[in-house]
């Protein structure tokens, strides 16, 4: 049942700079188009067109100034609207920083975070130049120092749980952060049949408000193709270097529905949607004879 006393907003955040990939913006817009109609207001964050000529990193981070500007624009929307619930259509994973940080401050640092992702997202600029690999680290007070300074109330480590994380793919730095902070992990294999590992954590931590980060790369690329790791004929073999997701759509939906029965979900951020087939068809259509008349 919809609680009409709650104010929900939608944020369309077609950010691509955090992953340096053009399809992130296209994927965000397609996500919004695919979503059910809603009376909620839509707020679109201004994002420049993709730059095919990758610049030098700025203090270790690609497109640092643009990413900070977009973060601040999203924060300004939240400050003005003061929503109870937020839906985010991304975009790379970094789009979730401003909404998660803002909502955690609103709830006095007591918000829980369910990070549904095959990757840890706790790197630093010393480890990588793409900002989307640092977003959870930023929210915890680590990651990139400048982005972390934007987080008024860091998320408490005990109130964070990974769902679907592939531990075999963790770097030494990522493993160290997870171990040092004591971050909880529900492995893919623990989620194939039920969500008990996560619902127990919600009860143990007495989490009344929960933000859900859904990185679509938690899905198995053999069953869901709109992912970085399902790129047709890739120039770079992503699957040979980075861990790929193991869940399917039904399992992922069941996890989210199960946790929503235990607590109030205040944010759902959906990220990393790379619809290769739709993009390639779009590129074909614009090159056909008489199509542009």
What function would you assign to each model-found segment?
Residues 2-88, 95-109, 177-293:
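Catalytic cores of soluble, metal-dependent hydrolases
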Residues 124-127, 147-150, 171-178, 223-225:
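A short secondary-structure junction signal
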Residues 143-144, 165-170, 245-251:
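A general structural motif
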Residues 119-120, 166-168, 216-219:
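Short glycine-enriched loops at secondary-structure junctions
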Residues 150-185:
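Hydrophobic, aromatic-enriched interface-forming segments
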Residues 115-118, 140, 162-167, 187-189, ...:
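Short, structured patches in soluble enzyme cores that scaffold and shape functional sites
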Residues 123, 168-170, 276:
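Active-site environment of divalent metal-dependent phosphoester hydrolases
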Residues 85-159:
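Active-site histidine-anchored catalytic micro-motif
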């Amino acid at each position: 049942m919809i609680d009409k006393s709650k104010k929900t907003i939608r944020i369309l955040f077609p950010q691509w700079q955090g992953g340096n990939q053009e399809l992130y913006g296209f994927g965000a817009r397609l996500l919004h188009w695919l979503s059910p109609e809603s009376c909620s207001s839509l707020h679109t964050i201004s994002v420049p067109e993709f730059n095919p000529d990758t610049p030098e990193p700025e203090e270790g981070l690609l497109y640092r100034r643009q990413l900070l500007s977009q973060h601040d624009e999203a924060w300004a929307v939240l400050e003005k609207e003061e929503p109870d619930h937020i839906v985010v259509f991304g975009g790379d994973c970094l789009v979730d920083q401003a909404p998660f940080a803002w909502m955690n401050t609103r709830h006095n640092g007591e918000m829980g975070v369910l990070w549904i992702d095959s990757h840890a997202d706790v790197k630093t600029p010393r480890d990588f130049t793409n900002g989307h690999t640092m977003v959870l680290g930023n929210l915890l007070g680590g990651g990139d120092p400048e982005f972390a300074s934007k987080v008024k109330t860091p998320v408490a480590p005990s109130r964070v749980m990974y769902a679907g994380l592939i531990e075999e793919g963790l770097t030494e730095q990522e493993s160290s952060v997870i171990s040092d902070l004591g971050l909880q992990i529900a492995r893919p294999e623990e989620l194939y049949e039920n969500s008990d590992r996560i619902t127990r954590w919600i009860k143990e931590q007495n989490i009344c408000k929960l933000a859900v980060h859904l990185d679509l790369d938690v899905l198995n690329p053999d069953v869901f193709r709109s992912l970085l790791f399902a790129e047709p004929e890739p120039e770079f073999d992503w699957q040979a270097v980075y861990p790929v997701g193991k869940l399917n759509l039904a399992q992922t939906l069941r996890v989210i529905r199960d946790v929503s029965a235990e607590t109030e979900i205040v944010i759902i951020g959906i990220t990393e949607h790379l619809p290769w087939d739709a993009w390639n068809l779009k590129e074909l259509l614009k090159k056909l004879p008489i199509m542009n008349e």
